[in-house]
């Protein structure tokens, strides 16, 4: 519990001080497929707006990794992998966890649920 409280405090400090935040991990200890929950945590724990959490997972992540010339936004000439969710994540950020399909390289992959 102390570690979770420390993480919450760190996120709030970073948000309050306008530190650029990228959503995601390359840590082997975090189960793959749960990253969408980070959008929710950034809003609930960090006080981000839903849009700020989405930016953290898209354009901020690309920029902070040095890949923003190729990805991170829906811009002509950039690579685009797109996720679709059933509702507006700006109204309910938990919609980011309800992916209905992913489009990668122009091919649509639908979820089974």
Regions found by a protein language model. Give the residues of each.
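Short aromatic-centered micro-motifs
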Residues: 102
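His/Asp/Glu-enriched, well-ordered alpha-helical/loop segment
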Residues: 1-89
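Short, Lys/Arg- and Gly-enriched loop/turn segments at beta-strand edges
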Residues: 89-95
